[in-house]
């Protein structure tokens, strides 16, 4: 890593600001929502067979926007069945946002919510220590495997938490997205800081295959307008550049040679396309659905 570079995750408020800007400028949530509308009903069609309560576990659920859409699909498939929704989220700010979202949401009468202010590894440690392993019918890990230290171990643990007919749903950047060449080329020079791993869905599929897990993959097309990243002094452009590199104040703190290389590569066909004067980054995602043993 180049000295002087600090992980974006070390400045929580700047990370949250840059992440919100990323969502505004990308089709990330829209493509997830389309997947939930069109594909999720089939995926969850058998998770609640003959069960009085459906147990759901969200790992790194953020403020709950995507969670509640998935809960709605489970409710539609199993009307009147109680849902026990456990949420593991390390950000107190995001948990507060989730609780506010639940308070305003209609039709949650059969759903109970429990929030755990923890990382996934802290949750795993507590469950293992207590020796009280709840089995879950549906577990989801959306855009969070970058932030665990032991990815294979995490996959193995949460797969072991699945009930019969249970499903583990993972969403991560695709191996053919613009993120993949960026991380492959510059990962060693950007601030991992033990806080972020440059891992794609392709890496996850290899790990699952080596474990002998049964899974299916779905590709989601997504893009992000990064035009402002190339306008020096543009505040939103600086924040998006921070998000793309996971680096705090990247333009100001990165060595000139590294900064210029990355800015050049962000415009290259490996990462982006140019359309109507805008630079559109390839933000494609993959959904991996892991079956219970």
UniProtKB/Swiss-Prot annotation:
The keyword S-adenosyl-L-methionine applies. Pfam families: Methyltransf_23. GO terms for cellular component: cytoplasm. S-adenosyl-L-methionine binds at residues 60, 89, 94, 120, 142. Its EC number is 2.1.1.8. InterPro entries: HHMT-like (IPR016673), SAM-dependent_MTases_sf (IPR029063). This is Histamine N-methyltransferase B.
